Amino acid sequence: MAAGKSARKVIMKERNTTLETTDHNNRNNSENIKETPDERIPGKLIGAIVAVGSLAFIGILTETVMTVLFPQLMREFNVNTATVQWITTIYLLTVAATMPLSSYLNRKFKHRVLFLAAVALAVLGSLTMIFGHAFPVILVARIIQGIGSGVATPLMMNIILEQSPRSKVGRLMGVGSLVITVAPAIGPTVGGAVSSILPWRAIFVIVIPVI
C-alpha cells in the first residue's frame, strides 16, 4: 500500500510538472504570437527591395520588349528571322548562366556592391544598344544586359529572405514574384507602343534614367 501511494505521488508530481511546463510554453507561444503582428518592415529594407526590384523588372521587361522589334531589326541590320532571334536567345542564355552564380556572389560580396554592379551593367548594356550600329555589337549589348539581370533578380530574393522579418517573408516573396511575372506580360505592349511612334532605340533611352 505504501509503495502504491508513493507511486501515485510520483505520478501526480510528474503530471503537475508537465502541466506547469505546458502552461509556461503556452504563455511563451502566446507572447510570441502577440509580438509577430507588431513586426515592421524597415523603411531601408523597403527602399532596397524597390530599387533592386525595379532593376530586375526593367531587365525582364527589355527581354520581351525585343520580340516585337524583330521586323525593324531585320530591316536595319539586314538579317533573317533565325539570326535576329539570337537577340533574345543570347540574353536568356546569359541570364541562365549567371543566376546559378548568385549564391557564390552573395557570399563574397555585399548586397550594395552587387546592386551597383548590376546597375552599371544595365546602363552599359543600354548605352551599347543605343549606339551600336552592327548586329554583333547588339548581341554583345544583350550579353551585358543579361549578366546584369542575372545578378539583380536573385539579389532581390536574397535581400527579402535574409533581411525581412520572418512574418513578412511570404508577403514580400509574393511581391517579388509579381515583379518577375508582370514584366514579361507587359513587355510586348510597351515595346509596340513605343516603337509605333519612336525609333526602337528610344526604348533604351527611356530605360536609362529609370535605372
Model segments located where?
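Transmembrane-helix bundle of Major Facilitator Superfamily
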Residues: E20-I211
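Short, intrinsically disordered terminal tails adjacent to the first/last structured region
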Residues: M1-I33
